[in-house]
Curated annotation (Swiss-Prot):
It is found in: Secreted, Extracellular space. GO terms for biological process: oxygen transport. Hemolymph. Its main location: secreted. One of its GO terms (molecular function) is oxygen carrier activity. Keywords: Copper, Oxygen transport, Secreted, Transport. Hemocyanins are copper-containing oxygen carriers occurring freely dissolved in the hemolymph of many mollusks and arthropods. This is Hemocyanin C chain. Belongs to the tyrosinase family. Hemocyanin subfamily. One of its GO terms (cellular component) is extracellular region. It comes from Cherax destructor.
């Protein structure tokens, strides 16, 4: 089922995006 793979890929993309946003926020807080 190809649709299942696409769904997993989308979930992985969402997770990566959320982690990226959190990483950005942490860097902003640590900036002088």
């Amino acid at each position: 089922d190809g649709s299942g793979g696409a769904s997993d890929a989308q979930k992985q993309h969402d997770v990566n995006y959320l982690l990226f946003k959190v990483y950005e926020d942490v860097n902003d807080e640590n900036s002088p």
